[in-house]
């Protein structure tokens, strides 16, 4: 384990029907491979120790005896393995046969979790062989030992308290009220599902949505291991679709019709953080009180130190995809829909504020940069919704020491092409006079030099807003606010900040979307040039007429800064 991550796996072994010896050997081989890769939790399919499709052979004493021998081999091999296994198998208890997941750790059976919901419809007839699992935990005997058996079992790691495991089997997750709901409310952070779900047309997509949706609803990790090749095809075909999901996101999915072992690193810290943030995620019915907890220990030093070279992993590599632009959809169609949605949300927010205050005027400091451009576009949309003339949008451009011809021209052209009013107020003399009043050296280009300009601009915007009875529209975006990249009592102040929840990486796409869809070539050309302009507050004098102060040279590219806010917002 490393930085709150834990490596988990869903494995589909090659099996033979009614051959526990062969099947246990295949399970052990996958266990060895997983251990070499640093896997700490490994889930196998339903009844994989015998095969799901044994039919009436399940009722034969010979098969049940050999199944226990297979389990013994697994237990023996697991003694030196620092991991927890969920192995599907039949289990006799008080004269009845149950479909269960045996939970194994270091040569010990931690518990036996029976399947509660036995399908007996369509192609399934499990009630012919098995008894529905009990919720209340009982003790079952194994080799002279008393083992807890029941649905309401939690398996908690002493050395990593964030890791609390629970199990359900196949059909259990397909019912209206799956056991995993109670598991999660009782404290389980990772759900293991030993499954044997057959293939029918379109079922793979439903299965994918079901598992990802359940992990989202329960704010948990979900490891789904499905039966595959090796099962009898007399009545059913199994595709071995394995899925590892976390809080609604599929971390990895196996190809169907090919037995495989998939691995991923779950972020338990994210799960705990998200549950803490969701104040509605709580055990209203005190379900935890009916659960029993079994404790185990794992080595928490490093999940990656044993990665095999065959896997092509570096020792410090995390087995999960880290989206470099988490706020921006990669699919073009989805990205367009997202941009339209965000622009509508921004405009609706401003529309309500304007209508509530009966405000008919807006004041925007238009610099020719990305943020003020987006603020103008949002304001235009809100004014159009309210049927307020666009000339009531007062764009104020305030050139000073750092303003370049490029941004100045773009600001002026943009205001004219959108139909907004434009006023130019050169603040050079006002700022120079202010610096003279406070005895600041004009050649000293320090924070006073920069912030003096920003505060002068805000003062002008506020005064004009008073004069026209309008509202100053804030331009700062979420990335700048998260970094504190703003001037106190300067550009961080406004009456309504329409960009406050929009990261800089997304600002670019919103402006580009508007440029692509506005239907006005001259306006589109200006917007595209704004996109091509380096991000800058333009508070330092230009060099050879070009921007000398580039924000991303000072605070690093904004792409880096979107990761932290995304993690903070979404756990």
Model-derived features: where do they sit?
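Enzyme catalytic cores with a strong preference for nitrogen-chemistry domains
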Residues: 1-363, 381-390
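ATP/NTP-dependent adenylation/nucleotidyl-transfer catalytic domains that generate, transfer
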Residues: 161-163, 219-220, 229-232, 246, ...
